[in-house]
C-alpha cells in the first residue's frame, strides 16, 4: 500500500473528531488538504473492510510518518504493525487473550502484561498495554525508571461502531478488535535498545548484531 493516503481515510472514516490534534499540520505531513503521508497503518484496515466486508482477520505493517521531534523514543518515520478481527460475538476477552498470547510468545512466558484504560477515537473501549521490564524482570531498574514496567507497548480496543458503519459493516451484527504497535518500539523492548535513533543511523557495528 502507498505511503500517501487520503485525509478522509486516515481520520474521518476512523472516527477522529474534527478538533483532534492529530489532524493538525504540526502532527501530520500534508501534500494538500486531501492528501497526506499516512500517520498510521489504519487506512489499510479501512480499505480492507470496505473491499472485503466481514468477517475479516488481517495483519498489516509498514512505514508511517508523524511530525514528531526526534528523541530517544520518537522519530518522524517509524514502522507500525496493526491487527484487526471483525466477526460475530467478538469480545474484549478475545482481544486480551490474543495479546497475552503474543506477549508471552515474543518476550517469554515470564513476562506479565498490564492493560490500562485509554482513549483512541477508533476504538471503544480503548486500552494501552504495558509489559514487565525485560531488563529487570519487573523488579525495578534504571531502564524502567524503577517502576518494573517497560514503556507503553501497544494500543488496542474494540472497533468503534462508527468505524464499522463507515466501512459498510453492520455494528448490530458484527463486532471486532484492533491493535497497533510500533515495530521499532517492540524491538527496543526485546533487544534492550535505549535509543530509537540507533536503528536509522546506518551504524554497521550496531546493525550486524541482528
Where are each of the predicted segments found?
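TRNA-recognition modules of translation machinery and tRNA-sensing kinases, especially anticodon-binding
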Residues: 4-210
